[in-house]
Amino acid sequence: MLEFTDKPYQFFPPNPSPTVIRIAHWLNHQIILPGPNHRISELQIDGDERLRELIASGAHILFLPNHSTHSDPHIMSEVHRQLGIPSAFMAAYDVFLRSKLNAWVIQRTGSFSVDREGSDRKAMSTAIEVLKSVRSL
């Protein structure tokens, strides 16, 4: 269930950990996606040959999913895992406030917060820096 907060906005920067990312990818692929909340047993990427060519050429790629379901971040994480590229997600700051453990894990997977109700310049500048440095967002 979604929970929203009236607490003042606090920026949570990305703090990626290769170990946490590997564990998160495994959990997502093996348990979360096929589990009862998502029921996704297989994911096939159409056009992955072209994406792989772009990645090999050093292109920086920005994915803009519609986010029509709660499965979208998990699906995009699996796409990134299959392509072998790092993920970085911009997530509503409310998600980081649900628990300290939740915030810690989300930051270690390379994600950072955004205030969707305002003009969050820190999140925008972070998105640009992440895109410049990791080749995908």
List PLM regions with ranges:
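Membrane-anchoring hydrophobic helices of lipid-metabolizing enzymes
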Residues: 1-78, 98-103, 107-111, 126
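Residue-level signal for alpha-helix termini/capping positions
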Residues: 55-56, 81, 131-132
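Conserved Motif II region of HX4D acyltransferases
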Residues: 59-66, 87-89, 126-137
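Carboxylate/His-rich catalytic cores and anion/metal-binding grooves
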Residues: 77, 84-91
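Short, solvent-exposed loop/turn segments at the edges of secondary structure
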Residues: 84, 106-109, 134
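A polyanion-binding, active-site-adjacent surface
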Residues: 89, 111-113
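Short beta-alpha junction loops
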Residues: 92-96
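Glycine-rich anion/phosphate-binding loops
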Residues: 116-122
